[in-house]
């Protein structure tokens, strides 16, 4: 049986737990009565992708080359579209989309669509994310197009509470 959804490609490895969680969410959200009804998924968990926050904000090694290679490998492997379970990597989504002939789904755009559909009167949305995600403004850029403001923690709370909980530091 061919899935009506096609084959999902997961651009993973940033961190591996986020990749595993995305896969589990796909499994748990798919109504099936037998194994053969699940959606085909190709996972490329690439631990060689440099730290996104370091590369974007602090002059570290750019993650873009490895993100491009990984996206292309998913396409060549038969993925019909790609998802990226890493917010900060969406900073490079235009380049990733331009590098392949299959859709690269933006979870930020999908989040906006969800909020607009479920909560059409909301004008402010809270964001807990890495410092890289917040400082790049990738959520602000997308949500401002819908006249929504993004609220995030103050710098001190961001580093001491949010980053600590994400990275376990």
Where are the language model's segments positioned?
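Non-catalytic structural scaffold of enzyme domains
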Residues: 1-169
């Amino acid at each position: 049986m061919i899935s009506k959804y096609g084959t999902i490609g997961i651009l993973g490895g940033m961190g591996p737990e986020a990749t595993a969680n995305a896969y589990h969410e796909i499994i748990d959200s798919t109504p099936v009565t037998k194994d053969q009804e699940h959606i085909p998924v190709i996972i490329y968990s690439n631990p060689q992708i440099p730290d996104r926050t370091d590369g974007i904000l602090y002059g570290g090694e750019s993650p873009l080359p490895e993100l491009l290679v990984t996206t292309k490998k998913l396409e060549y492997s038969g993925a019909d579209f790609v998802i990226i379970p890493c917010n900060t990597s969406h900073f490079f989504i235009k380049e990733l989309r331009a590098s392949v002939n299959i859709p690269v789904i933006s979870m930020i755009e999908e989040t906006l669509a969800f909020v607009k559909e479920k909560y059409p009167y909301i004008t402010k949305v809270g964001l807990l994310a890495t410092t890289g995600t917040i400082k790049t403004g990738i959520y602000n850029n997308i949500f401002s197009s819908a006249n929504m403001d993004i609220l995030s923690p103050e710098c001190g709370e961001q580093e001491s509470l949010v980053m600590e909980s994400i990275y376990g530091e």
